[in-house]
């Protein structure tokens, strides 16, 4: 009897303490001790066919800021632009660290750009932004890199058209184009060998299966013990990718040591040049290995930049064209706009043309809204109290702008399931509320490169070719709807015909 009373007393105390904690946060379903809202999230995801519809269900029920408890941890999701701006920009200094997924931190050691915090992350971000500036990101130099790759791929398309009056294009065209651009920035080489690229792309796609709320939050020991195959998939795929990107680094180091290659520290050809130069300088100052500028950090920085720079942009291009071929009127409007400003196609579209292409800009924004690559965004951890909308978020809370939910928020975008370009022309402020690259201090470091790729590739392909669907187009439904990363059906094909 005494044991029962003690047990009931303990449960009562835990529940009362939990209730008091819950009251301080934005509204949400009431959590259970230990498991939080895990059972409710799983049920809603199953019932609604994915994690994104489940999170959108909670938005509709509780508002644009709501709380879900992942076990004993509170997570606050923000799903509108104004509040995201308030929390992650105006109060961004209070929450720049990420909640690191145990399995990914185990794989990376907390090093790099994506799965890192503190001074390590800050130093690598500063280095990357400085290196991009030195390499001409935002200038004609970057534009030339992108256009050289696109022109090379289009020569292959033109050869097909010359033989067959049309070219059949699938997702590989976009994957290889974007993959070669990012590879040229990272290690100065385009992908000449298609099989080499497809191998590394397959590894990234496989690792997406375990990129979900469950795998990213349970302890490593749990995965190793009870789900060893899932642990192995994440571990093996990430390390094989890292081993792949390091092959070029090892080759570069051998060439430097033999005198066959020299680095100009003021004008690096790629990220590897810049990093090796900085590493040498820091080692000379420190008299030994630097804690941040070492080969392990280089490996993780290359991995993170490749992951962030290839899959997201290539997927957006593929999804975008699959949307456009079902809206031929939009393609015609874009082509008319482009022909008008390029003297009837006498020259390529350039980044300087952006202010004069409002229809293309609006179309790209709508494509990015629909493509939304992440179903669940990385949570951050606030180290100071955050106040917004009469709520108080205590230090140590997980908090995120859930961009995927924001992009289907009918309060911001009328009829969000529809593909509608006109709304941005009627209300240009909506362009700012499409935030596929995130918001605040942890926004995508390669945002400028990705935006330039999207504009130049979409624009110049539509300036050169009539694009139509070849057979039926996939629905663009998520292949892994319970994953944190969206992976669309990529079985669709396109027909390119010369204008």
UniProtKB/Swiss-Prot annotation:
What does the record give as the organism's lineage?
Eukaryota, Metazoa, Ecdysozoa, Nematoda, Chromadorea
GO biological process terms, semicolon-separated = organic acid metabolic process; xenobiotic metabolic process
Q: Gene for this protein?
A: cyp-35d1
Family the UniProt entry places it in:
Belongs to the cytochrome P450 family.
The source's domain of life comes to Eukaryota
Q: Which PROSITE patterns match?
A: CYTOCHROME_P450 (PS00086)
What this protein is called in its record is Probable cytochrome P450 cyp-35D1
Q: Specify which residues bind heme according to the UniProt entry for this protein.
A: 444
Q: Which organism is it from?
A: Caenorhabditis elegans
Gene disruption phenotype: RNAi-mediated knockdown causes a reduction in the quantity of a hydroxylated thiabendazole (TBZ) metabolite and probably its glucose conjugate.
What does the entry say induces or represses the expression of this protein?
Up-regulated in hypodermis, intestine and vulva following exposure to specific xenobiotics, such as thiabendazole (TBZ). Expression is up-regulated over 2000-fold by TBZ.
- Role description: Cytochromes P450 are a group of heme-thiolate monooxygenases. They oxidize a variety of structurally unrelated compounds, including steroids, fatty acids, and xenobiotics. Involved in the oxidative metabolism of thiabendazole (TBZ). Catalyzes the conversion of TBZ to its hydroxylated form.
């Amino acid at each position: 009897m005494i044991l029962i009373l003690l047990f009931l007393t303990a449960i009562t105390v835990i529940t009362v303490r939990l209730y008091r904690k819950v009251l301080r946060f934005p509204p949400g379903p009431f959590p259970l001790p230990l498991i939080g809202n895990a059972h409710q999230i799983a049920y809603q995801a199953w019932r609604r066919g994915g994690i994104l519809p489940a999170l959108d269900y909670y938005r509709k029920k509780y508002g644009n800021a709501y709380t879900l408890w992942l076990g004993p941890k509170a997570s606050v999701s923000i799903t509108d632009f104004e509040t995201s701006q308030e929390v992650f920009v105006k109060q961004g200094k209070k929450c720049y660290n990420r909640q690191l997924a145990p399995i990914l931190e185990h794989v990376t050691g907390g090093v790099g750009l994506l799965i890192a915090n503190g001074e390590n992350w800050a130093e690598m971000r500063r280095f990357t932004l400085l290196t991009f500036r030195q390499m001409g990101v935002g200038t004609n130099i970057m534009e030339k890199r992108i256009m050289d790759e696109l022109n090379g791929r289009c020569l292959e398309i033109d050869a097909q058209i010359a033989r067959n009056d049309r070219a059949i294009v699938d997702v590989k065209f976009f994957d290889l184009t974007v993959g070669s651009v990012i590879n040229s920035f990272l290690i100065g080489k385009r992908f000449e060998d298609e099989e080499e690229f497809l191998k590394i792309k397959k590894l990234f796609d496989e690792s997406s299966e375990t990129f979900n709320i469950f795998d990213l939050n349970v302890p490593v020991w749990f995965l190793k013990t009870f789900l060893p195959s899932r642990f192995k998939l994440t571990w093996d795929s990430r390390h094989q990718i890292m081993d792949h990107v390091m092959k070029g680094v090892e080759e570069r180091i051998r060439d430097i040591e033999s005198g066959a290659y020299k680095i100009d520290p003021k004008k690096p050809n790629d990220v590897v040049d810049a990093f090796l130069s900085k590493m040498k300088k820091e080692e000379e100052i420190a008299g030994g290995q630097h804690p941040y500028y070492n080969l392990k950090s280089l490996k993780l920085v290359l991995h993170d930049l490749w992951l962030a720079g290839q899959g997201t942009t290539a997927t957006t291009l593929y999804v975008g064209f699959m949307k456009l071929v079902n809206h031929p009127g939009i393609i015609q409007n874009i082509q008319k706009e482009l022909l008008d400003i390029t003297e009837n196609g006498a020259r390529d579209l350039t980044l300087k043309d952006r202010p004069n292409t409002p229809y293309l800009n609006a179309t790209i924004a709508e494509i990015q809204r629909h493509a939304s690559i992440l179903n669940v965004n990385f949570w951050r951890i606030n180290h100071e109290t955050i106040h917004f909308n009469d709520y108080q978020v205590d230090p140590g809370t997980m908090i995120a702008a859930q961009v995927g939910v924001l992009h289907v928020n009918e309060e911001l975008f009328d009829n969000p399931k529809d593909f509608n370009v006109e709304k941005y022309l009627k209300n240009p402020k909506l362009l700012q509320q499409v935030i596929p690259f995130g918001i605040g201090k942890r926004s995508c470091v390669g945002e400028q490169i990705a935006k330039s790729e999207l504009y130049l590739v979409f624009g110049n392909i539509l300036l050169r070719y009539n694009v139509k669907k070849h057979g039926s187009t996939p629905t663009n439904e998520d292949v892994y709807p319970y994953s944190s990363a969206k992976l669309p059906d990529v079985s669709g094909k396109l027909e390119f015909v010369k204008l």
